[in-house]
């Protein structure tokens, strides 16, 4: 028995080492592509490209979900030539990742203004016909993508949007130039370097010990509730942001909080969602909704939330004029935050 356990442990260590080694190799390869323009250009030769049009990714429908097709450099050059575009437009692409086999992945938007083409935007309908797909708004398609494509396209859209918004130096007013990977932009007149940034957002599930507080904004789909969320102000820690947001939005004071996880979110322009659990002071649970921030907020029981987690929205209006209570889809960190609370409540209610 001890011999078997020893072999099993060694095998586990071996596979963990291989996983770590693959991750380190992949990470350092991406670092090299970001730092070395020549290496990145070489990677484009054997890489694959995800296409966008005005920040909407090219998608194809398959078995009740969307797939994000990839195109080789040769296919992309042929496509650009067919639509009268210079292949130099490929220099607008940005690096978004790579496979374990070091196939580099890039994203290129064919609908945004380009410094390499007079007629910058390619016509969307003709492109969709040629590519046998559709350019679909990412917000609408995100939850019908697999996890890998959702992550890659979210990264791509945020990077493409950032580059489109930072084509000029804020100090000199002169055009900035991106490196091949798109990991930075430089102003040639003063050498100021601009790096893509994300805005930190604290998303918090508030609990009073037995219930959790969920809210909705007027922009949410009908019937959907989620955890409280707000941008970090300059000078604030995450903890201070959470306490302020809870006080501002629902008039409650946080007693304790615990970090859960984080997630990149491409909307509205690239955010880092920092998810936490928070507990309010006992006996101080009366909600005072700030209508400038929220449409409504309410306490929900464990059973109500557990049932809502099983629903898939959005829903149509019921005969009585209401919409069923549902929660954000699984890919959203708010869903995972709420799910963990339900699981913890379930475990704590079980007999010892």
Curated annotation (Swiss-Prot):
Residues 196-323 form the Nudix hydrolase domain. InterPro entries: NADH_PPase-like_N, NudC-like_C, NUDIX_hydrolase-like_dom_sf, NUDIX_hydrolase_CS, NUDIX_hydrolase_dom, Znr_NADH_PPase. It is an enzyme of class 3 (hydrolase). CDD domains: NUDIX_NADH_pyrophosphatase_Nudt13. Its main location: mitochondrion. It holds the Pfam family NUDIX-like. It is found in: Mitochondrion. GO terms for molecular function: metal ion binding; NAD+ diphosphatase activity; NADH pyrophosphatase activity; NADPH pyrophosphatase activity; pyrophosphatase activity. Its cofactor is Mg(2+); Mn(2+). Disulfide bonds: none annotated. Divalent metal cations. Mg(2+) or Mn(2+). GO terms for cellular component: mitochondrial matrix; mitochondrion. A motif (Nudix box) lies at residues 216-240. It catalyses: NADH + H2O = reduced beta-nicotinamide D-ribonucleotide + AMP + 2 H(+); NAD(+) + H2O = beta-nicotinamide D-ribonucleotide + AMP + 2 H(+); NADPH + H2O = reduced beta-nicotinamide D-ribonucleotide + adenosine 2',5'-bisphosphate + 2 H(+). Keywords: Hydrolase, Magnesium, Manganese, Metal-binding, Mitochondrion, NAD, NADP, Transit peptide. Residues 1-20 form a transit peptide. Highly expressed in metastasis-suppressed chromosome 6 melanoma hybrids. One of its GO terms (biological process) is nucleobase-containing small molecule interconversion. Its EC number is 3.6.1.22. It comes from the Eukaryota. Signal peptide: none annotated. Belongs to the Nudix hydrolase family. NAD(P)H pyrophosphatase that hydrolyzes NADH into NMNH and AMP, and NADPH into NMNH and 2',5'-ADP. Has a marked preference for the reduced pyridine nucleotides. Does not show activity toward NAD-capped RNAs; the NAD-cap is an atypical cap present at the 5'-end of some RNAs. NCBIfam families: PRK00241.1. This is NAD(P)H pyrophosphatase NUDT13, mitochondrial. It comes from Homo sapiens (Human). The gene is NUDT13.
């Amino acid at each position: 028995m001890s011999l078997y356990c020893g072999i099993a442990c060694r095998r586990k260590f071996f596979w963990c080492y291989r996983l770590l080694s693959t991750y380190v190799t992949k990470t350092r390869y991406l670092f090299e592509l970001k730092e070395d323009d020549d290496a990145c250009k070489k990677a484009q030769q054997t890489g694959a490209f995800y296409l966008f049009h005005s920040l909407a990714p090219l998608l194809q429908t398959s078995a009740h979900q969307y797939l994000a097709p990839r195109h080789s450099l040769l296919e992309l050059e042929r496509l650009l030539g067919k639509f009268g575009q210079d292949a130099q437009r490929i220099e607008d692409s940005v690096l978004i990742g790579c496979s374990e086999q070091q196939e580099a992945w890039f994203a290129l938007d064919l609908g945004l203004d380009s410094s390499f083409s007079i007629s910058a935007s390619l016509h969307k309908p003709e492109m969709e016909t040629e590519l046998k797909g559709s350019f679909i708004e990412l917000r609408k398609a995100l939850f019908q993508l697999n996890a890998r494509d959702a992550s890659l396209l979210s990264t791509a859209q945020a990077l493409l949007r950032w580059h489109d918004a930072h084509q000029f130096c804020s100090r000199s007013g002169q055009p900035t130039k991106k490196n091949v990977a798109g990991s930075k932009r430089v102003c040639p007149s003063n050498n100021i370097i601009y790096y893509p940034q994300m805005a930190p957002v604290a998303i918090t599930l508030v609990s009073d010990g037995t219930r959790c507080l969920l809210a909705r904004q007027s922009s949410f789909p009908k019937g959907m509730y989620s955890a409280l969320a707000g941008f970090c102000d300059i000078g604030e820690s995450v903890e201070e942001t959470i306490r302020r947001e809870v006080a501002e939005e629902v008039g409650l004071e946080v007693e304790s909080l615990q970090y859960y996880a984080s997630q990149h979110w491409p909307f509205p322009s690239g955010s880092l969602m920092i998810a936490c659990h928070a507990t309010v002071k006992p006996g101080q649970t009366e909600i005072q909704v700030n209508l400038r921030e929220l449409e409504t907020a309410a306490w929900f029981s464990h059973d109500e939330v557990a049932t809502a987690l099983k629903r898939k929205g959005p829903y149509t209006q019921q005969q009585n004029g209401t919409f069923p209570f549902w929660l954000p889809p699984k890919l959203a960190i708010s869903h995972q935050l709420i799910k963990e609370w339900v699981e913890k409540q379930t475990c704590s209610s079980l007999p010892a």
